[in-house]
From Swiss-Prot:
GO molecular function: structural constituent of ribosome
Region Disordered, residue ranges: 1-22
Entry annotated with the keyword Ribosomal protein: yes
Species: Pseudoalteromonas translucida (strain TAC 125)
Gene this chain is encoded by: rpmA
Lineage: Bacteria, Pseudomonadati, Pseudomonadota, Gammaproteobacteria, Alteromonadales
Name of the protein: Large ribosomal subunit protein bL27
GO biological process annotation, one example: translation
Disulfide bonds listed in the record: none
């Protein structure tokens, strides 16, 4: 049995905590105002109607309704909108 650790092994063993990013409410789901729809780094998704964006680029609902994802515009950007009933 070795009494010395292998070279380099003592410098391993660290990793950052996962940030739980991604889509939290999918297309067609009902949401209430203030609900978080997407957590993201940067603007992978852009806010559409009845949707706001936080300082950390979190997309959230400004009104009650159903989530709708769409791609539009000359740059084919992804937009999140809330369709109110």
């Amino acid at each position: 049995m070795a009494h010395k650790k292998a070279a380099g092994s003592t410098r391993n063993g660290r990793d950052s905590e996962s940030k739980r990013l991604g889509v939290k409410r999918f297309g067609g789901e009902s949401v209430l105002a203030g609900s978080i729809i997407v957590r993201q780094r940067g603007t992978r998704f852009h806010p559409g109607t009845n949707v706001g964006i936080g300082k950390d680029h979190t997309i959230f609902a400004k009104a009650d309704g159903k989530v709708q994802f769409e791609q539009k515009g000359p740059l084919n950007r992804k937009y999140v909108t809330i369709v109110t009933e």
